[in-house]
Regions:
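Sec-dependent bacterial lipoprotein signal peptides
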Residues: 1-17
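Sequence signature of WD/YWTD-type beta-propeller architectures
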Residues: 19-413
Length: 413
């Protein structure tokens, strides 16, 4: 990632394409086989599981139930002398981590879900991105260095220690499922693994036209020289689809589906093309889902998105679609079982746009917007000019404002 004030080239192309593309469509590829979810969807916000962590309108961190009840303050001193950013829950425990700047300096802060067991691990610079390892024992951190580049540092919670593992700008990474190493895409052309001792192994050629790789149980997904590629265990590479331009993609946790959009300037022919090699050619300026096992491609919407986020069960995709009326609003849509439905429209909070949506392919791996049971999701923004934290259920019902605030993330359990 890169924290330069300019919008990334991919996002700039997305904005251009969005202004010239047609409105979204819920059409899907012919012959699609849908898989029905086995868990009934919750329709009442009060019945949703897990906890939310919010940065409230005073800048403090608070956890609460999904309906806003049972709030637990984590910090209470935000202001001129203390600032807190991007709190998230561990994937395996009731533990929080966040970036902080206080009178004691910059640090990675941590506590349990109710503010107990507080600790602060000093850092040389404030983290602007944090990504828990799947086992919850560590966090990969990105922050700026004194040399003007980005440093990648791993925090070991048990030892309360940190170690710089790499540097470069931009810097994107993805944890291996066993938490033993990361796959990194650095300075556009470096593609390598980095283990917990800092040892680097080159993964070979990679393309420039993407940001974050994604390591899933199936292997490492990245943009190769021939298209969207899955590098499997043992080094074998499989091209899933060819792409007409730069891409952003997110893979579900199971590694079975990839949501992809390829951004190109100018008009592109609609639809999905099949190459002679039977490798599908993805359309430009559209969002599609690729089934990893079968290679089938399903069209989600026929215009670019500002953000894509998979549900924990891997069956539903949250699509944040720009509304082309000059209002700055987005449509929160859900693709599920081959169908797209609009859940709400809202104006996303500026912090969410600047910090998350610019890099949604990276945050899609670390930020939990969905409830643990995949029945709902939470967003920070304004609905009908009412700002706050809004919880949505995908089975129906109006979104519910549960708190004031600028940031929200859901626990994993």
């Amino acid at each position: 990632m890169s924290r330069r004030p300019a919008v990334s080239a991919l996002c700039l192309l997305l904005i251009i394409a969005a202004c010239t593309s047609q409105e979204g469509s819920s059409s899907t590829a012919a012959g699609e086989t849908t898989v029905a979810a086995t868990t009934p969807l919750v329709t009442d916000v009060a019945e949703l599981p897990g906890r939310l962590v919010v940065i409230d309108d005073g800048g403090n961190i608070v956890t609460m139930d999904p309906d806003g009840s049972d709030p637990a303050p984590i910090t209470e001193d935000a202001g001129d002398s203390a600032g807190y950013r991007q709190p998230t829950f561990s994937p395996v425990a009731d533990t929080l981590a966040w970036s902080q700047i206080t009178a004691d300096g910059t640090a990675l802060g941590s506590s349990d879900g109710r503010g107990g067991s507080r600790m602060a691990i000093p850092m040389n610079a404030p983290p602007f991105y944090m990504y828990w390892s799947p086992d919850g024992n560590g966090i990969g951190v990105l922050h700026n260095s004194a040399q003007g580049t980005i440093e990648f540092e791993i925090v070991d919670f048990a030892a309360q220690s940190t170690q710089v593992m790499g540097s470069g700008s931009p810097f994107y990474f993805s944890w291996s499922p066993d938490s033993s190493q990361v796959a990194a895409h650095v300075q556009f052309d470096v593609f390598a693994t980095i283990d917990l001792e800092g040892n680097r192994s080159d993964l070979g050629a990679t393309a420039e036209g993407y940001q974050a790789p994604h390591w899933a149980p199936e292997g490492i997904f990245h943009l190769g020289e021939d298209g969207l590629e899955l590098r499997q265990e043992g080094g074998e590479a499989r091209v899933l689809a060819t792409t007409p331009g730069p891409v952003a993609f997110v893979v579900n946790r199971q590694g079975t589906r990839v949501a992809v959009q390829s951004i190109v300037a100018g008009d592109q022919p609609p639809g999905i093309n099949a190459a002679i090699t039977q490798t599908p050619a993805l359309p430009g300026n559209a969002v599609v889902v690729v089934d990893v096992e079968s290679g089938q491609v399903y069209e989600v919407v026929d215009s670019p998105s500002f953000g894509l986020f998979w549900s924990p069960d891997g069956t539903s995709l949250l699509v944040l679609q720009p509304i082309q009326d000059g209002s700055g609003e987005i449509s929160a849509m859900v693709w599920r079982n081959g169908e797209v439905s609009e859940v709400s429209t809202l104006s996303p909070h500026p912090a969410f746009v600047e910090e998350v949506l610019r890099f949604f392919d990276q945050y899609g791996q670390s930020l939990q917007l969905w409830s643990p049971d995949s029945s709902g999701f939470a967003l920070a923004g304004a609905i009908d000019d009412e700002p706050g934290i809004w919880v949505h259920t995908i089975a129906g019902g109006d979104p519910v404002k549960v708190a004031e605030g600028s940031w929200v993330s859901w626990s994993n359990t």
